[in-house]
A protein has these predicted regions:
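Pan-zinc metallopeptidase signature
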Residues: 85-94, 98-154
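Residues that form generic nucleotide/phosphate-binding pockets
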Residues: 8-12, 81, 96, 100
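Short N-terminal micro-motifs specific to bacterial/archaeal maturation
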Residues: 35-38, 65, 121-122
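Histidine-centered divalent metal-coordination motifs
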Residues: 49, 53
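Substrate-binding clefts and substrate-entry loops adjacent to catalytic sites
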Residues: 57-65
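Post-HExxH zinc-binding segment in Zn-dependent metallohydrolases
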Residues: 66-95
Length: 154
């Protein structure tokens, strides 16, 4: 049983739309937080994390490292500000939170690997990287929850 109801959360954040969706996510354009299901405390914590993105004004990012910072700050806000409001005791060290952060760190690392030599490259633009080892360049897609693709361009 959840410690708080969805109607209570909707009441507490009238400026946001909360809608059932396929994945937990925040859409800044429509001011909508999407949630998969709310069957467990982990689901509730994930919902609070997405609400944290909204409360922190998170929108777009230009460099992948900015996404990592946004994710970390949203988790910190959920842990320090939102969870206590609903009687939840969370820590940044919780396995679920670290697993979520690890998934973004792993995603970032995979994007940065040179498809030519395997060295870690440097991000040049929002969707391209350069290898400092072999000087290859590659484009990446924006996939975070599906298959990451890298396309060598030089």
């Amino acid at each position: 049983m959840l410690s708080v109801s969805l109607p209570q959360i909707k009441h507490d954040f009238p400026e946001l739309q909360l809608k059932e969706g396929e994945v937990f996510s925040w859409n800044p354009n429509s001011q909508t937080v999407y949630y998969e299901k709310l069957d467990s405390q982990e689901d509730l914590v994930q919902l609070l994390h997405e609400i944290a993105h909204a409360k922190l004004g998170h929108k777009n990012y230009q460099h992948d490292i900015q996404l990592i910072e946004m994710e970390r700050s949203a988790w910190e806000y959920a842990v320090d500000t939102l969870a206590p409001k609903y009687g939840l005791t969370l820590s940044m060290d919780d396995d679920n939170i670290q697993d979520c952060l690890d998934s973004y760190r792993d995603w970032l690392h995979k994007r940065s690997l040179c498809p030519q030599c395997g060295a870690v490259g440097l991000q040049a633009t929002a969707s391209s990287y350069r290898c400092i080892n072999c000087h290859s360049e590659w484009r990446v897609n924006q996939a975070k929850s599906c298959q990451l693709k890298r396309y060598q361009i030089k």
